[in-house]
Amino acid sequence: MTTILDELRWRGLLYESSDGLDDLLERERVTLYIGFDPSADSLHIGHLLPLLTLARFQRWGHTPIALAGGGTGLIGDPSGKTQERPLLSKEQVAANVEAIKRQLAQFLDFNAGDHSAMLLNNAEWLTRLSLMDFLRDVGKHLTVNYMLAKDSVRSRMMSETGISFTEFSYMLLQAYDFAYLFEHYGCKLQAGGSDQWGNITAGIELIRRTSGQKAYGLVYPLVTKADGTKFGKTESGAVWLDPKRTSPYRFYQFWYNVDDADVGKYLRYFTWLSAAEIEELEQITARQPERRTAQQRLAREVTRMVHGEAALARAEEASQALFGGSLASLSADDVADIFEDVPSITLPRQDLEGDGMSLIDALVRCGIATSKSDARRAIEGGGIYINNVQSADVGRRLTLHDSIDGQCIVLRKGRRHYHLIRLV
């Protein structure tokens, strides 16, 4: 491989790029940027591709700029949207920017000498831009005809809801971002998802018209799933990078559960593994799909990258708990997260004080057993587990000593029939 573009090609991450970009990257190290929309107080897994694109360029010796959209976030990007988005308050956008800046920082190297990463906020220049300056310095150079020809605008113009002037102007603001970074930081390249191509080329055109110089664009494909459903969404919503919004366990499980048809592509997109390593994992999947070897490697690589080694270890311990693994090292929060979807009952903590409650009564109250005699037979048959530890004693009583952090107890019948007791 001679340039970063060769790596992006074999990973399937080069959807479209400006003419001459290969030659530019062979000649020199460049500064590039990708913008991040602060529409929430956390990035989600859909942002991993742009984050890793910046990181991959940096590993090839280029200088990445992660641009938080503190200014453009006040407007809202219409690209890929079928209707107008509600405007966020200035205070909410500012708070979101601060939150995502911390996440952006963990993927890039800010102490890499002459190609150290930069973290900028376009509110610094957009909020100082007067309406008169905007119309003279930006609006004058891009015609309405040019803007209407862009897919992001044309598709909205054809819809019932149309597009407001506010969102229509977003393209000009993003173009100004590129021109500003070109002038002040020598940034020659903007990257983004394929739905950003129209906005990126508008910036290239603005730079050409205002400075007579050439800038470049590059877009990667939007992430898709083989079954046609939206990537990055689960039944409970988006998969966030913030562990408070999506626990490392559920983050790990998302990647572990990807389809065989997608796992090879995602290994290329979201990990640093080599082509040879990925091809070997794909061959194992083809021969023995039930082992889920590739999915496990994908889950390990991405969880470690986002949450760290310690969180990965806990996520794997938690994953084993569903298959009878030990709960000894897990917290009550971990257990509640793992067993969120299993049947549960709530009991007063005082019911387990002192001698507590008989295991037989607990099994009946949970519904694991239909009667006391049914519970007795299950215990005597060795099929009952307390916190994944087998209990064959029909005289066993549940007390607070059995609880995890005084908050919950996990009962199990057989291999997979779980029930959670929550204590209040």
UniProtKB/Swiss-Prot annotation:
Cellular component per GO, a single term: cytosol
EC number: 6.1.1.1
Compartments it resides in: Cytoplasm
Main location: cytoplasm
Stored InterPro entries: aa-tRNA-synth_I_CS, aa-tRNA-synth_Ic, Rossmann-like_a/b/a_fold, S4_RNA-bd_sf, SYY-like_C, Tyr-tRNA-ligase, Tyr-tRNA-ligase_bac-type, Tyr-tRNA-ligase_bac_1
Motif ('HIGH' region): 38-47
Residue ranges annotated for the S4 RNA-binding domain, each copy included: 357-424
PROSITE patterns reported in the protein's UniProt record: AA_TRNA_LIGASE_I, S4
Annotated positions binding L-tyrosine: Y33, Y170, Q174
A GO molecular function held by the record: tyrosine-tRNA ligase activity
Binding site for ATP: K233
Keywords of this entry: Aminoacyl-tRNA synthetase, ATP-binding, Cytoplasm, Ligase, Nucleotide-binding, Protein biosynthesis, RNA-binding
Catalytic activity: tRNA(Tyr) + L-tyrosine + ATP = L-tyrosyl-tRNA(Tyr) + AMP + diphosphate + H(+)
Motif 'KMSKS' region location, chain numbering: 230-234
GO biological process, one term: tyrosyl-tRNA aminoacylation
Quaternary data: Homodimer.
Family that this chain belongs to: Belongs to the class-I aminoacyl-tRNA synthetase family. TyrS type 1 subfamily.
Function of the molecule: Catalyzes the attachment of tyrosine to tRNA(Tyr) in a two-step reaction: tyrosine is first activated by ATP to form Tyr-AMP and then transferred to the acceptor end of tRNA(Tyr).
HAMAP family tied to this protein: Tyr_tRNA_synth_type1 (MF_02006)
Protein name, as recorded: Tyrosine--tRNA ligase
Gene name for this UniProt entry: tyrS
